A protein has these predicted regions:
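Flexible, solvent-exposed loop/hinge segments and secondary-structure transition points
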Residues: 2-190
Length: 190
């Protein structure tokens, strides 16, 4: 018995079969890559923090992070202490970089939740630098940054990123010339 490919049932069964096969493949790929994705997100965060304290491979006007395979080693070398602030408590935690600032911001809407605010203390060239994550709204979507300041509250480095800003002016926050404009500015200037 030959299949009648002219009927609607054939088309429907073919479409359902294709969806099941492709969906299964995508689910298998997603679950097999979960660990790699998680590790890459951690490395990216470490690279961002390192960039904010001036540990990068800059060439010209580009923003070049330290290589991913060196990020963890360099992070552990320069970041001497990790803490987070929760309510009125300061808690030392060597995994503070795992705190998701976006999720903490969303949880802050619940008055019973005390959100965790991470702070990274680095030592570079004999001086302490304090790196804090910042998150806010851009024109179209979220903007976030890591800003490093010294004991005098002078900005020593910053790294900006965004999810979906306009290709023109908004996307310039990822350009080195934009980030370099903040270096040397005081947080305490009025």
């Amino acid at each position: 018995m030959a299949l009648n490919t002219e009927k609607n049932t054939y088309t429907l069964l073919f479409a359902v079969g294709l969806v099941v096969i492709v969906g299964t493949l995508l689910a298998a790929i997603d679950s097999s890559l979960k660990d790699k994705i998680r590790i890459n997100k951690i490395l990216e965060k470490q690279q961002n923090i390192l960039y904010a304290i001036g540990i990068n491979e800059n060439e010209g006007n580009s923003v070049n992070f330290i290589a991913a395979d060196k990020a963890e080693k360099e992070f552990n070398k320069y970041i001497t202490k990790q803490i987070y602030i929760q309510g009125d408590q300061v808690i030392e935690d060597d995994k503070a970089y795992l705190i998701d600032v976006k999720k903490q911001k969303a949880l802050a809407k619940d008055p019973s939740h005390k959100r965790k605010l991470p702070l990274f203390i680095a030592e570079k060239d004999g001086r302490n630098l304090y790196v804090a994550p910042i998150r806010g709204k851009g024109l179209w979507d979220a903007i976030w940054a890591y800003v490093s300041v010294d004991e005098d509250m002078i900005i020593r480095g910053i790294y900006f990123d965004h999810k979906a800003e306009t290709p023109g002016l908004g996307a310039n926050i990822k350009q080195r010339f934009f980030m370099d404009d903040f270096i040397g500015e005081s947080l305490l200037d009025s």
